[in-house]
Structures are given as C-alpha cells and as structure tokens.
Amino acid sequence: MSVKQINVFLENEPGRLAEVTSALSKAKIDIRAVYVTDSTSYGILRLIVNQPDDAKIVLQSMGFTVSISHVIAVALKDVPGTLDQVLEILSSNGIQLEYLYAFVGRASVDAVVLLRVDDREKTLEIFEKNGIKVLDDKEVYGI
C-alpha cells in the first residue's frame, strides 16, 4: 500500500514555485501536502495531490522535470510520542528512513505522516505487525 508523491525539480528563481501552484490550481488539482528541500541553485518540491497522474502531465507540459515516487502514509494520533513510537519501530527493525513530512487533514483527527524508506514492503509488514494504521492512496487524496 503506497501513495503517489509528485517530485518536481525547481530552479531557485523567484516565482518558480508559484508557477507550479498556479498550474495545479488551473487544472483543479488540490494539494494535500507539500515539502520543499533546497540547495544553493535548485530545490525539490514534493507534493501529495488528489490527482497525481494528472498533475505530472500538467507540470511536464510546462517544461518541469517531474517524477512520481511512492511513499507510505500512516495515521497517528495527534498526541506527543506517537511519531517517536513509529521511528523507534523502524530503527529497531533496521529500516532506513530517507525523509518524512506530516500534515493534519480536514477529514480526520489523526495526523498523517508520509514516509520514504529504503524497504517499503518490509516496512508495511512491520507496521501491520505493530498495529500502525497505514492509509491507502484514496484515503490520503481525500483528506
């Protein structure tokens, strides 16, 4: 079970991020979560949207370099310590966390944490064994 994440390579220039959000807005694509990393000359924009395949097409048609990767979405109670529990489980099972970001949706009281790991299938098995609620793509896109 995974969620499609849009990855967009952006030059560090004024207005580049606004070009992306404007294009998605015009295409009626709703952004659910956003995460930006940057370096001196470029950034990587990571998006969870309600229509990932359409978003990729729209952005590529505008000349952006776009890829889709798969991340795991888990629902966590929005209380202190729940993220720590998940990270401890990953660590104790030898799973390398590449990055994560989180958001609180409007259709749930839980926080949603999106994780990119080195072994997605093993992580899903570990989460199931430990009672961690993994969300499917439709649940995340609908939040």
Can you name each region flagged by the protein language model?
Residues M1-I143:
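A conserved regulatory-domain signal marking ACT and ACT-like small-molecule sensing domains
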